[in-house]
């Protein structure tokens, strides 16, 4: 099925590309998410007339993502308190939701889906590097300091 992409899609293309995808992928994911429209003659003409407007919208979203990434990087360190044992092992773990809530409380709005923990949840006290994927092209880093709760 031929579709026109309205946004950058990983491993597929960027705004304005006409790509051939499986019908189910287009029908169940790309079209409902607003990332693509079927490549009919009417849609191709409509897209070409609105191309500049859509490119400006994508540029605005990207600029907002860069601004949020700068705010996250500017925070430097966020401290979380959690119950732990004598050797610094936590009772439980610190996951994406806990980190997202702490960063949001520090003043930068972050969704838990934007937090990247490549090594899984955090289970020890100390400082940990955490990545944030604010946009498909924009990443930020933050240090999370986990301290033992008194």
Swiss-Prot record:
GO BP: translation
Presence of the UniProt keyword Ligase in the record: no
One GO cellular component, as annotated: ribosome
Database matches in Gene3D superfamilies: Ribosomal protein L9, C-terminal domain (3.10.430.100), Ribosomal protein L9, N-terminal domain (3.40.5.10)
Keywords of the record: Ribonucleoprotein, Ribosomal protein, RNA-binding, rRNA-binding
Its biological purpose: Binds to the 23S rRNA.
Family that this chain belongs to: Belongs to the bacterial ribosomal protein bL9 family.
Protein name per the record: Large ribosomal subunit protein bL9
